[in-house]
């Protein structure tokens, strides 16, 4: 799948954003994350063109603007960031991931994993700052009203949630005031959100559910069931 998306992107027919599993693949390929069977990444690393694929992958964005009214990230945009701030902070991490000096990349990957800090402040610095940005854009599901992250919950919207925390998209969003937000990551949602300006396009396809597509031109959603599982 990665090779196919790269071919499409090379022709200008596709674009992608990085998610938590992509970062795990990159870290594993650099020898900075233990590769587990459930990650299903070893075949990519061992492929004849594996190095080229991973080098291409690490140079992809965390945040993409398909048009002037739309933001795409893997996990979403926290309520405390507007569109401009989201783009600027994403670029900070993207610059490190795509750095020509691989020691700069490795230094970040070695410190990328962790759930602290769990609340954004503008005075964060170094790898803590980069980790916090990465967690918001690739791991976020629940936050509190101040934007603090909660990582343990992965269930459906109907399940009980930790006190004080809600799905990030249930809080008034600065970015959604000016842009439509698209995200994946949270397969248990199966495409459900409560906001017309925030769309989930992870239908749980890898778990045997649906593959979701959304046509921006006319705001039309399409869903196809997984015929394999």
Predicted regions and their residues:
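Active-site neighborhood of divalent metal-dependent phosphoester bond hydrolases
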Residues: 1-3, 7-126
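Acidic, His/Gly-rich catalytic cores of divalent-metal-dependent hydrolytic chemistry
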Residues: 87-229
């Amino acid at each position: 799948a990665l090779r196919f998306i790269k071919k499409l992107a090379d022709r200008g027919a596709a674009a992608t954003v990085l998610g938590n599993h992509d970062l795990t693949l990159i870290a594993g390929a650099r020898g900075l994350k233990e590769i587990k069977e459930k990650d299903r990444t070893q075949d990519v690393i061992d492929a004849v063109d594996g190095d080229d694929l991973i080098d291409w992958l690490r140079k992809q964005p965390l945040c993409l603007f398909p048009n002037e009214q739309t933001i795409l990230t893997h996990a979403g945009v926290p309520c405390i960031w507007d569109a401009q701030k989201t783009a600027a902070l994403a670029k900070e991490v993207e610059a490190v991931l795509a750095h020509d000096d691989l020691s700069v990349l490795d230094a970040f990957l070695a410190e990328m994993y962790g759930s602290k800090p769990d609340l954004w402040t503008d005075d964060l610095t170094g790898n803590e700052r980069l980790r916090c940005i990465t967690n918001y854009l690739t791991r976020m599901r629940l936050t509190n009203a101040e934007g603090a992250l909660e990582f343990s919950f992965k269930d459906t919207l109907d399940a009980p949630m930790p006190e004080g925390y809600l799905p990030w998209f249930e809080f008034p969003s600065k970015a959604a005031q000016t842009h439509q937000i698209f995200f994946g990551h949270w397969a248990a949602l199966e495409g459900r959100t409560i906001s017309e300006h925030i769309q989930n396009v992870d239908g749980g396809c890898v778990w045997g559910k649906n593959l979701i597509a959304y046509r921006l031109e006319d705001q039309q959603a399409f869903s196809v069931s997984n015929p394999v599982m």
